[in-house]
Amino acid sequence: MPTYNEITLAKELIRFPSITPIDAGVMKFLAKKLTTIGFKCKILEFKDKNSKPVKNLYARLGNTQPNFMFAGHLDVVPPGNIQDWTIKPFSPTIKKNHLIGRGANDMKSAIASWVVAVNNYVLTNKKINGSISLLITGDEEGVAINGTKKVVDYLKKKKEKIDFCLVGEPTNPNKLGEMIKIGRRGSINAELTIIGTQGHVAYPHRAKNPSTSLIKILNEIKEIKFDKGTKDFQPTNLEVTKININNTADNVIPGLARATFNIRFNNKHTSSSLKNRLNKIFKKITKKDKSNFKVEYRVSGEAFLTKPNKTTYMIQDVIKKITKIKPQLSTTGGTSDARFIRKIAPCLEFGLVGKTMHKVDEAVSISDLKKLTKIYSEILKNYF
């Protein structure tokens, strides 16, 4: 059995320009590496009529319970203007004790650390009292419809039991060891269209200005105090992100007015309860103004919380032991693929420092990368 190194493996993964939904061969490459350790690998390609096909990987070492799964993604965001980078984004380079390259931080390096941790564990332990698995997607940075969500459905169909999942997203704001994610807020995006009657500005009685209703609605929903937050979650928050009347003439009352907004919500609400509350406001105001509305909602995920258990506290203790920092159990930040995995297993998230994710010259500290491998190795040792 070969011995792998996290820096070398991270570099190899970064060299693949796997910009969502392009695979560029990275999933097959990782599967080959895992096969040498003893994993049975299955590359799963999913597609949708409105989206391009995406490759995913499920790999398992062992065939008994408990099954400890690591989840992550090998797709990356586009590098943007390459001229702004000090290196070629997919030519990983070490400078000033940092590994630079697109995906170094989010999240190819964490995957490399996990693979090396498993490799080391297998080399020093002839028998695993259970199974180790990986769920790696190529659709986390995109629309996320042909990725983890469908792999989870596949695992449910195959009756594959997952006892615990560690998601390797970059969870730490500033220093390695600061934060473990034990849940995430839900997210709703909405596009609201108010339908009025177009007309001449000099004859408002012959028209119905939709912007009047839109302004009233936006004012009302922005003033809503949804809740005060909970012990584990921030207060629910609504932000208006776009207002568009799309009227190029100064002497025309528009026929349509649109706005988009996002709600990040805690576990005091569901997407359905929030939509019902908002729809009542839309109906009330448009009825009074004699206008009409239509609204399209897109729910990225529901709020969820993994109640801390002995595995959570074990991982917290391991991180503290290696980093000398006791990590906070948090639910802050955006959505992640944990929102899909939590349907089949308790899960938490811990990875690198997220300062440079999606940025020009995305980078990870070499010291942090090595420490993360130690943390993952200790987690395996303590879990089994």
UniProtKB/Swiss-Prot annotation:
UniProt cross-references to Gene3D superfamilies, sorted A to Z: 3.30.70.360, Zn peptidases
Pathway named in the protein's UniProt entry: Amino-acid biosynthesis; L-lysine biosynthesis via DAP pathway; LL-2,6-diaminopimelate from (S)-tetrahydrodipicolinate (succinylase route): step 3/3
Residues that hold Zn(2+) 1 according to the record: 73, 106, 169
Name of the top EC class for this enzyme: hydrolase
Catalytic activity as recorded in UniProt: N-succinyl-(2S,6S)-2,6-diaminopimelate + H2O = (2S,6S)-2,6-diaminopimelate + succinate
Any one biological process term the GO annotation gives: L-arginine biosynthetic process
Keyword hit for Signal: no
Binding, Zn(2+) 2: 106, 141, 358
Named cofactor requirement(s): Zn(2+); Co(2+)
PROSITE patterns: ARGE_DAPE_CPG2_2 (PS00759)
Keywords: Amino-acid biosynthesis, Cobalt, Diaminopimelate biosynthesis, Hydrolase, Lysine biosynthesis, Metal-binding, Zinc
Physiological role: Catalyzes the hydrolysis of N-succinyl-L,L-diaminopimelic acid (SDAP), forming succinate and LL-2,6-diaminopimelate (DAP), an intermediate involved in the bacterial biosynthesis of lysine and meso-diaminopimelic acid, an essential component of bacterial cell walls.
Subunit text: Homodimer.
Family, similarity comment: Belongs to the peptidase M20A family. DapE subfamily.
Protein name listed in UniProt: Succinyl-diaminopimelate desuccinylase
